[in-house]
Protein backbone atom coordinates (compact mmCIF):
# COMPACT_ATOMS: atom_id res chain seq x y z
CA UNK A 1 0.00 0.00 0.00
CA UNK A 2 1.50 3.35 -1.07
CA UNK A 3 2.04 6.22 1.39
CA UNK A 4 -0.42 9.08 1.17
CA UNK A 5 0.86 12.13 -0.72
CA UNK A 6 -1.09 14.95 0.99
CA UNK A 7 -0.63 18.68 1.72
CA UNK A 8 1.09 19.10 5.07
CA UNK A 9 -1.38 21.81 6.07
CA UNK A 10 -4.82 21.03 4.64
CA UNK A 11 -4.26 17.29 4.04
CA UNK A 12 -5.71 17.52 0.55
CA UNK A 13 -4.20 14.91 -1.78
CA UNK A 14 -1.46 16.31 -4.05
CA UNK A 15 -1.41 13.49 -6.55
CA UNK A 16 -1.59 15.00 -10.04
CA UNK A 17 -1.56 18.58 -8.67
CA UNK A 18 1.02 21.34 -8.50
CA UNK A 19 2.65 21.58 -5.14
CA UNK A 20 5.64 23.16 -3.41
CA UNK A 21 8.22 21.54 -1.18
CA UNK A 22 9.17 23.85 1.68
CA UNK A 23 11.51 22.86 4.50
CA UNK A 24 11.06 19.17 3.59
CA UNK A 25 7.28 19.44 3.62
CA UNK A 26 4.88 19.31 0.71
CA UNK A 27 2.05 21.80 0.45
CA UNK A 28 -0.54 22.82 -2.06
CA UNK A 29 -0.28 26.20 -3.75
CA UNK A 30 -3.10 27.66 -1.69
CA UNK A 31 -1.49 26.68 1.61
CA UNK A 32 1.90 27.84 0.37
CA UNK A 33 0.53 31.34 -0.19
CA UNK A 34 -1.17 31.25 3.20
CA UNK A 35 1.53 29.75 5.40
CA UNK A 36 4.89 29.74 3.62
CA UNK A 37 5.14 32.51 1.03
CA UNK A 38 7.39 35.52 1.63
CA UNK A 39 5.67 38.90 1.90
CA UNK A 40 6.56 41.54 -0.69
CA UNK A 41 8.26 44.58 0.90
CA UNK A 42 6.48 46.90 -1.52
CA UNK A 43 2.86 45.73 -1.86
CA UNK A 44 2.75 43.70 1.39
CA UNK A 45 1.09 40.80 -0.41
CA UNK A 46 2.40 37.19 -0.40
CA UNK A 47 4.69 36.18 -3.23
CA UNK A 48 2.94 33.12 -4.64
CA UNK A 49 4.75 30.00 -5.76
CA UNK A 50 4.20 30.73 -9.44
CA UNK A 51 5.35 34.39 -9.17
CA UNK A 52 8.88 35.60 -9.83
CA UNK A 53 10.62 36.70 -6.66
CA UNK A 54 13.55 39.08 -6.01
CA UNK A 55 15.35 38.93 -2.68
CA UNK A 56 18.07 41.15 -1.24
CA UNK A 57 19.43 41.10 2.31
CA UNK A 58 16.55 39.07 3.76
CA UNK A 59 13.93 41.21 2.04
CA UNK A 60 11.62 40.01 -0.73
CA UNK A 61 9.74 41.59 -3.62
CA UNK A 62 7.56 40.55 -6.52
CA UNK A 63 9.79 41.10 -9.55
CA UNK A 64 7.42 43.80 -10.85
CA UNK A 65 7.42 45.49 -7.42
CA UNK A 66 11.20 45.73 -7.30
CA UNK A 67 11.56 49.35 -8.49
CA UNK A 68 13.63 52.45 -7.85
CA UNK A 69 12.24 54.27 -4.80
CA UNK A 70 12.66 57.61 -6.63
CA UNK A 71 11.69 57.16 -10.28
CA UNK A 72 9.92 53.76 -9.99
CA UNK A 73 11.97 52.30 -12.83
CA UNK A 74 11.82 48.43 -12.74
CA UNK A 75 15.08 46.98 -11.43
CA UNK A 76 14.51 43.20 -11.36
CA UNK A 77 16.93 42.67 -14.24
CA UNK A 78 19.19 45.71 -13.71
CA UNK A 79 21.93 46.81 -11.35
CA UNK A 80 20.85 48.93 -8.41
CA UNK A 81 22.11 50.70 -5.29
CA UNK A 82 20.86 50.32 -1.73
CA UNK A 83 21.05 53.60 0.20
CA UNK A 84 19.60 54.17 3.68
CA UNK A 85 17.27 51.22 3.21
CA UNK A 86 16.01 52.46 -0.17
CA UNK A 87 16.53 50.70 -3.49
CA UNK A 88 17.66 53.17 -6.16
CA UNK A 89 18.60 52.96 -9.81
CA UNK A 90 22.12 54.12 -10.64
CA UNK A 91 20.89 57.44 -12.02
CA UNK A 92 18.86 58.35 -8.94
CA UNK A 93 21.63 57.15 -6.64
CA UNK A 94 23.97 59.60 -8.36
CA UNK A 95 21.45 62.37 -7.78
CA UNK A 96 21.15 61.42 -4.13
CA UNK A 97 24.87 62.02 -3.72
CA UNK A 98 24.85 65.20 -5.81
CA UNK A 99 24.78 68.70 -4.26
CA UNK A 100 21.41 70.40 -3.97
CA UNK A 101 20.56 73.69 -5.68
CA UNK A 102 20.02 76.48 -3.14
CA UNK A 103 17.26 77.86 -5.36
CA UNK A 104 15.07 74.89 -6.32
CA UNK A 105 16.53 72.31 -3.89
CA UNK A 106 16.85 69.76 -6.69
CA UNK A 107 20.02 67.79 -7.37
CA UNK A 108 22.73 69.28 -9.55
CA UNK A 109 23.99 66.41 -11.66
CA UNK A 110 26.87 66.08 -14.07
CA UNK A 111 26.34 68.28 -17.11
CA UNK A 112 24.16 70.84 -15.32
CA UNK A 113 25.44 74.41 -15.61
CA UNK A 114 25.83 75.78 -12.10
CA UNK A 115 27.08 78.71 -10.05
CA UNK A 116 29.03 78.24 -6.82
CA UNK A 117 29.56 80.95 -4.22
CA UNK A 118 31.07 80.46 -0.77
CA UNK A 119 30.36 76.73 -0.66
CA UNK A 120 26.76 77.01 -1.88
CA UNK A 121 25.68 75.95 -5.35
CA UNK A 122 22.79 76.86 -7.67
CA UNK A 123 21.61 75.79 -11.09
CA UNK A 124 22.67 78.58 -13.44
CA UNK A 125 19.03 79.53 -14.14
CA UNK A 126 18.16 79.45 -10.42
CA UNK A 127 20.78 82.05 -9.50
CA UNK A 128 18.65 85.19 -9.83
CA UNK A 129 18.61 88.79 -8.63
CA UNK A 130 16.74 89.15 -5.32
CA UNK A 131 15.12 92.35 -6.60
CA UNK A 132 14.22 92.00 -10.29
CA UNK A 133 14.32 88.16 -10.36
CA UNK A 134 16.28 88.18 -13.62
CA UNK A 135 18.80 85.36 -14.05
CA UNK A 136 22.29 86.41 -12.99
CA UNK A 137 23.85 83.11 -14.03
CA UNK A 138 27.58 83.58 -14.40
CA UNK A 139 27.30 87.39 -14.72
CA UNK A 140 28.50 90.01 -12.24
CA UNK A 141 26.58 90.37 -8.99
CA UNK A 142 26.75 91.93 -5.54
CA UNK A 143 26.07 89.90 -2.36
CA UNK A 144 24.09 91.61 0.39
CA UNK A 145 23.50 89.40 3.43
CA UNK A 146 21.66 86.34 2.12
CA UNK A 147 20.59 88.13 -1.05
CA UNK A 148 22.24 88.70 -4.42
CA UNK A 149 21.72 91.64 -6.74
CA UNK A 150 22.48 92.22 -10.40
CA UNK A 151 24.62 95.25 -11.18
CA UNK A 152 21.67 97.44 -12.19
CA UNK A 153 19.58 96.72 -9.08
CA UNK A 154 22.56 97.11 -6.77
CA UNK A 155 23.33 100.51 -8.26
CA UNK A 156 19.70 101.58 -7.82
CA UNK A 157 19.25 100.31 -4.25
CA UNK A 158 22.64 100.52 -2.57
CA UNK A 159 25.45 102.16 -4.52
CA UNK A 160 26.70 105.62 -3.62
CA UNK A 161 26.41 108.21 -6.37
CA UNK A 162 29.21 110.52 -7.42
CA UNK A 163 28.53 114.15 -6.45
CA UNK A 164 29.90 115.33 -9.79
CA UNK A 165 28.33 113.03 -12.41
CA UNK A 166 25.57 111.56 -10.20
CA UNK A 167 26.29 108.07 -11.52
CA UNK A 168 26.66 105.02 -9.29
CA UNK A 169 30.08 104.22 -7.85
CA UNK A 170 30.35 100.48 -8.39
CA UNK A 171 33.98 100.02 -7.41
CA UNK A 172 36.78 102.07 -5.94
CA UNK A 173 35.85 105.71 -5.60
CA UNK A 174 36.99 108.22 -3.01
CA UNK A 175 35.37 110.25 -0.26
CA UNK A 176 36.20 113.87 0.54
CA UNK A 177 34.38 115.72 3.30
CA UNK A 178 31.81 112.91 3.48
CA UNK A 179 31.01 113.20 -0.22
CA UNK A 180 31.60 110.28 -2.65
CA UNK A 181 33.38 110.68 -5.96
CA UNK A 182 34.53 108.53 -8.82
CA UNK A 183 38.32 108.72 -8.83
CA UNK A 184 38.14 109.91 -12.45
CA UNK A 185 35.70 112.68 -11.50
CA UNK A 186 37.77 114.08 -8.63
CA UNK A 187 40.11 116.23 -10.74
CA UNK A 188 41.73 119.65 -10.80
CA UNK A 189 39.23 122.21 -12.05
CA UNK A 190 41.90 123.84 -14.21
CA UNK A 191 44.01 121.07 -15.77
CA UNK A 192 41.79 118.00 -15.07
CA UNK A 193 44.63 116.14 -13.36
CA UNK A 194 43.33 113.35 -11.09
CA UNK A 195 43.66 114.38 -7.45
CA UNK A 196 43.12 111.03 -5.72
CA UNK A 197 46.22 110.32 -3.64
CA UNK A 198 47.71 113.72 -4.54
CA UNK A 199 48.05 116.97 -2.61
CA UNK A 200 45.41 119.50 -3.58
CA UNK A 201 43.67 122.63 -2.31
CA UNK A 202 39.96 123.36 -2.13
CA UNK A 203 38.77 126.91 -2.80
CA UNK A 204 35.03 127.60 -2.69
CA UNK A 205 34.12 124.01 -3.68
CA UNK A 206 36.69 124.02 -6.46
CA UNK A 207 39.68 121.70 -6.30
CA UNK A 208 43.15 122.51 -7.59
CA UNK A 209 46.33 120.53 -7.98
CA UNK A 210 49.42 122.08 -6.38
CA UNK A 211 50.77 123.54 -9.62
CA UNK A 212 47.48 125.11 -10.73
CA UNK A 213 46.87 126.50 -7.26
CA UNK A 214 50.30 128.11 -7.29
CA UNK A 215 49.91 129.55 -10.77
CA UNK A 216 46.30 130.69 -10.78
CA UNK A 217 44.89 130.97 -7.28
CA UNK A 218 47.48 131.34 -4.52
CA UNK A 219 48.26 134.76 -3.10
CA UNK A 220 51.77 136.03 -3.71
CA UNK A 221 54.10 136.64 -0.81
CA UNK A 222 54.69 140.39 -0.32
CA UNK A 223 58.29 139.54 0.53
CA UNK A 224 59.58 137.04 -2.07
CA UNK A 225 56.70 137.45 -4.58
CA UNK A 226 56.33 133.65 -4.84
CA UNK A 227 52.98 131.86 -4.33
CA UNK A 228 51.90 131.06 -0.79
CA UNK A 229 50.66 127.49 -1.18
CA UNK A 230 50.24 126.34 2.39
CA UNK A 231 52.42 123.31 1.58
CA UNK A 232 55.83 122.39 2.91
CA UNK A 233 58.12 125.15 4.20
CA UNK A 234 55.59 127.86 3.45
CA UNK A 235 52.76 126.31 5.39
CA UNK A 236 52.68 129.14 7.97
CA UNK A 237 51.42 132.50 6.75
CA UNK A 238 51.40 136.02 8.14
CA UNK A 239 48.59 138.28 6.93
CA UNK A 240 48.26 141.98 7.60
CA UNK A 241 46.43 144.86 5.91
CA UNK A 242 45.40 142.76 2.94
CA UNK A 243 48.90 141.47 2.31
CA UNK A 244 50.38 138.04 2.99
CA UNK A 245 53.87 136.72 3.67
CA UNK A 246 55.51 133.36 4.15
CA UNK A 247 56.42 133.31 7.83
CA UNK A 248 60.08 133.05 6.88
CA UNK A 249 59.75 136.14 4.62
CA UNK A 250 58.17 138.32 7.28
CA UNK A 251 61.22 140.26 8.51
CA UNK A 252 62.32 143.82 9.24
CA UNK A 253 63.04 145.89 6.13
CA UNK A 254 66.20 147.38 7.69
CA UNK A 255 67.81 144.75 9.97
CA UNK A 256 66.17 141.65 8.47
CA UNK A 257 65.23 140.14 11.83
CA UNK A 258 62.31 137.72 11.45
CA UNK A 259 59.14 139.20 12.92
CA UNK A 260 56.75 136.24 12.67
CA UNK A 261 54.88 136.01 15.98
CA UNK A 262 56.62 139.20 17.18
CA UNK A 263 55.71 142.86 17.53
CA UNK A 264 56.31 144.95 14.42
CA UNK A 265 55.58 148.33 12.84
CA UNK A 266 54.00 148.69 9.40
CA UNK A 267 55.09 151.90 7.70
CA UNK A 268 54.73 152.89 4.03
CA UNK A 269 53.85 149.32 3.02
CA UNK A 270 57.00 148.03 4.74
CA UNK A 271 57.56 145.99 7.90
CA UNK A 272 59.99 147.13 10.60
CA UNK A 273 60.99 145.88 14.00
CA UNK A 274 60.18 148.37 16.82
CA UNK A 275 63.85 149.44 17.20
CA UNK A 276 64.31 150.19 13.50
CA UNK A 277 60.95 151.93 13.36
CA UNK A 278 62.15 154.47 15.98
CA UNK A 279 64.96 155.51 13.65
CA UNK A 280 62.69 156.29 10.71
Swiss-Prot record:
The keyword Metal-binding applies. There is a cross-link at residue 86 (Glycyl lysine isopeptide (Lys-Gly) (interchain with G-Cter in SUMO2)). A zinc finger (C4-type) spans 7-31. The modification N-acetylserine is found at residue 2. May have an involvement in muscle development or hypertrophy. Isoform 2 binds to RBP-J and plays a negative regulatory role in the RBP-J-mediated transcription in mammalian systems. This is Four and a half LIM domains protein 1. PANTHER family: FOUR AND A HALF LIM DOMAINS PROTEIN 1. SUPFAM superfamilies: Glucocorticoid receptor-like (DNA-binding domain). One of its GO terms (molecular function) is zinc ion binding. Isoform 1 seems to be most abundant in each tissue and isoform 2 much less abundant. Isoform 1 is highly expressed in skeletal muscle and lung, and to a lesser extent in heart, brain and kidney. Isoform 2 was found in brain, lung kidney and genital organs.
Amino acid sequence: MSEKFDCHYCRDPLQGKKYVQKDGRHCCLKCFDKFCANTCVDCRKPISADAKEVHYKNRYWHDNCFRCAKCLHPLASETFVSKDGKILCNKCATREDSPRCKGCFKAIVAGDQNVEYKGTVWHKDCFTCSNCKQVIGTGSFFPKGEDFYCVTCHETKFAKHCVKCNKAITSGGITYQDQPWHAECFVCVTCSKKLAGQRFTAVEDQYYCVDCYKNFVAKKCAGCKNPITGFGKGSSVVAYEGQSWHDYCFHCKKCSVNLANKRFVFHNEQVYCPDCAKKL
